[in-house]
């Protein structure tokens, strides 16, 4: 099976965990797109009813609305029952790097408001230690070059996330700097260091935030219980 087939398998499998009446966090990314497509199909067929979606990006919101899924702003709900999202890397101890799609800030806010968080990935995303995938940090535009320079001095090998010939803009109109770290020995210490740097809004380190992971494999979807 190719990677897209594994993503589709995983996305469809995750919809089995969505029940009628739920408030569901809808993530962002290529695997989540398959999940939202399947959810929309089941909503249209009347198999899942009265659900509300809270999205982690404007593009997921558009996709969901086009499929007939009711969408509400996160501040218009008091909780989220289940959030289903992708991940760029998941370590052996279920820590994650997210933000390859540029939605890390909204993703973390939605995850924090959720009773349960599920990540859906193909098996290529499972790693022993985090760090091979570039770690995104979201920065406000004002003074962002100074933040970039500080990260460079620390040896974190920063690069600007680009959108064509311009700097990529998040849904909050911020920039993203990707850090090429190779391997992260202490994710918590790194997260604490980065979040205390003035100008950094959020990091792509998602630590102790996931409950279950569905992994797409050639033998079929596999569910891993994190906590």
From Swiss-Prot:
Its EC number is 5.3.1.6. The active site is at residue 107. Substrate binds at residues 28-31, 85-88, 98-101, 125. The keyword Isomerase applies. Pathway: Carbohydrate degradation; pentose phosphate pathway; D-ribose 5-phosphate from D-ribulose 5-phosphate (non-oxidative stage): step 1/1. It holds the Pfam family Rib_5-P_isom_A. CDD domains: RPI_A (cd01398). One of its GO terms (biological process) is pentose-phosphate shunt, non-oxidative branch. Signal peptide: none annotated. It catalyses: aldehydo-D-ribose 5-phosphate = D-ribulose 5-phosphate. Keywords: Isomerase. One of its GO terms (molecular function) is ribose-5-phosphate isomerase activity. Catalyzes the reversible conversion of ribose-5-phosphate to ribulose 5-phosphate. Belongs to the ribose 5-phosphate isomerase family. Homodimer. HAMAP family: Rib_5P_isom_A. PANTHER family: RIBOSE-5-PHOSPHATE ISOMERASE 3, CHLOROPLASTIC-RELATED. This is Ribose-5-phosphate isomerase A. It comes from Limosilactobacillus reuteri (strain DSM 20016).
């Amino acid at each position: 099976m190719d990677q897209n087939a594994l993503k589709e398998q995983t996305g469809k499998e995750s919809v089995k965990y969505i029940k009628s009446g739920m408030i569901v966090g809808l993530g962002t990314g290529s695997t989540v797109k398959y999940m939202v497509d399947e959810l929309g199909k089941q909503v249209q067929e009347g198999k899942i009813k009265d659900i509300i979606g809270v999205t982690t990006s404007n593009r997921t919101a558009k996709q969901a609305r086009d499929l007939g899924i009711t969408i509400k702003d996160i501040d218009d709900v008091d909780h989220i029952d289940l959030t289903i999202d992708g991940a760029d890397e998941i370590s052996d101890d279920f820590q994650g790097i997210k933000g390859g799609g540029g939605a890390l800030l909204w993703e973390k806010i939605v995850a924090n408001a959720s009773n349960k968080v599920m990540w859906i990935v193909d098996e290529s995303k499972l790693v022993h230690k985090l760090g091979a995938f570039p770690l995104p940090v979201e920065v406000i535009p004002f003074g962002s070059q100074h933040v970039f320079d500080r990260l460079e001095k620390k040896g974190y090998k920063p690069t600007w996330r680009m959108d064509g010939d311009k700097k990529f803009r998040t849904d909050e109109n911020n920039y993203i700097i990707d850090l090429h770290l190779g391997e992260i020995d202490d994710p918590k210490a790194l997260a604490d260091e980065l979040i205390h740097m003035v100008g950094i809004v959020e990091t792509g380190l998602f630590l102790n935030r996931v409950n279950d992971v569905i992994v797409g494999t050639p033998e079929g979807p596999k569910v891993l219980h994190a906590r």
